[in-house]
Amino acid sequence: MSELNYEELGLKVGLEIHQQLNTSHKLFCNCSTNLKEDYKLTLERYLRPALSELGEVDVAALFEWKKGKKYVYRIPITTSCLVEADEEPPHAINEEALKIALAIAIALNSNIVDEIYVMRKIVIDGSNTTGFQRTAIVALGGMLKDEGVTIQTIAVEEDAARKIDERTDQVTYSLDRLGIPLIEISTGPDIRSPEQAERVALKIGQLLRMTGKVKRGIGTIRQDLNISIKGGTKIEIKGVQKLELIPDIVRYEAMRQFNLLKIKEELNKRGVSKNLILSNFVVKDLTELFKNTNSKIIKSGIEKGGLVYGIRAYKLKGILGWELIPKKRRFGTEIADYVRALAELGGLFHSDELPNYGITEEEINKVREALNATTEDGFILIVGERERLDKAVEVIRDRILLAFDGIPKETRGALDDGTTKFLRPQPSSARMYPETDIPPRRIDEKLLEDAKKFVPESPESKMKRYITLGLSEELAKEIIRDPRLDLFEELVNKYSPKVSPVVIASTITNTLKYVKSKGGDISKINEEDIEELIKSVYENKISKDSISEILLEYTTNKNVELKDVIRKYEALPTEELEKIIDDVISSNLDEIRKRKDKAVNLIMSKVMSKVKGRAEGKVILELIKSRLKNVME
């Protein structure tokens, strides 16, 4: 993928970091924040959008309501109560969660509000039994100084219910996660490159982890991105859980938006307008035409009682297949996303990708004839039941018309390859209204003093402290930049001074680089693995010198467990080590007498190759020197 000039493109990126807080209980009740599946009961709900204070309906809420889905909630015994079921009013806001959020606000030099007001944010995708999410702004403003990125808001809010299963007409959730406190940190649209977006997310994540009061693991932190380019509009991208995906998501989204604007230009060049699209919009039932088709998808749809519709796309030849992201997404993919989300239908084909999928040239010509399509026109084929097809036709028409606006306002979901898909329209200002069941909480001096206990240390202070621990300035800088900085702190607190902080820092940084350079798959190494190694050094099970070899063997062999590799490299008993040294010396006596004092390096090299990290180099050297001294006398 060719790199765009992001400055010329006018790229602007803002981040929203959502991190679960590790508090003793949930945000608005006393239930545990641990995830447990000990449910015995379920409840069912249908949710409807409510009017805002101004009598308006949020478009995103309306979109979800139109799906008509039933929501089923599992009720865990130990991690939910009547508050989660929306059968009891919420309790007072969790003070511990407030203190953690205030600590982060202090660290980011934000302006803390005088009073906290809880608001209701309308959400009717079923992830909240109430039909809204409770959220409260704690601070405004602030700055991530070394990146020049402003902080807009810091808020506490309740996490959503955990999705268990989704079908066409029903979604099942567990209430164990609903109500776990989250901190939300929103930056200004000040980020100007994909790489900076990742750095900012990393630094905010590190700041949160350094409080020691956030949860860790998959699903405990989520990044949302707001991305725009010159001439376009802000697009929200939800649910980025992997930090390393952020640069690709920004690159791909910038490219997608750039090409959508190019399509808008091309439509104008062709003299096409919305009115011309509508007046030449032809839809035909082509089921009979495809009754003997070799296309498996169309054939299967017809056999299930479905129909095949053909839609003329006036003067859109080449537009439907226009690559928004090379080899990943075309304009036709965007239309298909809308159809999946709004009409719940797959099985869409367009003329720019045919003949293919078993559809022949002869069938293409018959479709063109039936739709009265010229060589300048494109067409779309879709298969399904009549009711959904009629809805799909409306969706396809509306998405083609949106192409004349360039970039439609959307909320999109992040995918594992760094691309995104359409989820729903963007929510409007009609989404928020005050929570009437919870009184305001004034921020007093005592709350602020308690919060200061959780304020994380500044990078400058860390640098000085790490150097006093024995780290070089270069290693200290490297560990401060590393995503596993909080792991380093944790391991130093647990295992030093017996295990040197230098060894711990080097393992996390330099050793992993070495393993990767030797072909090891370092994605296999998690934080628990690193702690297991450091703990083994602490317990004298292995030598610190064996860490790199253990990790290399572990990451270059698919079917091995770390514990088995550690067992293989367990430290040699002193007697066995002495015997190896004596055997090497006795086998090289002539060379030793010839080299004299320089023989140490020869013997050291031969012993190390036999020991393979199962003993400390320092210990081996001392034993060799004492034995060579006896030989030379």
Swiss-Prot record:
Enzymatic reactions:
L-glutamyl-tRNA(Gln) + L-glutamine + ATP + H2O = L-glutaminyl-tRNA(Gln) + L-glutamate + ADP + phosphate + H(+)
Instruction: List keywords of the entry alphabetically.
Output: ATP-binding, Ligase, Nucleotide-binding, Protein biosynthesis
GO molecular function (one): glutaminyl-tRNA synthase (glutamine-hydrolyzing) activity
Q: Does the keyword Cell cycle apply?
A: no
Keyword Cell membrane: yes or no?
Answer: no
Q: What is its EC number?
A: 6.3.5.-
What EC class is this? Answer: ligase
Xref: Gene3D superfamilies: 1.10.10.410, GAD-like domain, GatB domain, N-terminal subdomain
Give the Pfam families listed for this entry: GAD, GatB_N, GatB_Yqey
The entry sums up its family as follows: Belongs to the GatB/GatE family. GatE subfamily.
Job of this protein: Allows the formation of correctly charged Gln-tRNA(Gln) through the transamidation of misacylated Glu-tRNA(Gln) in organisms which lack glutaminyl-tRNA synthetase. The reaction takes place in the presence of glutamine and ATP through an activated gamma-phospho-Glu-tRNA(Gln). The GatDE system is specific for glutamate and does not act on aspartate.
Protein name per Swiss-Prot or TrEMBL: Glutamyl-tRNA(Gln) amidotransferase subunit E
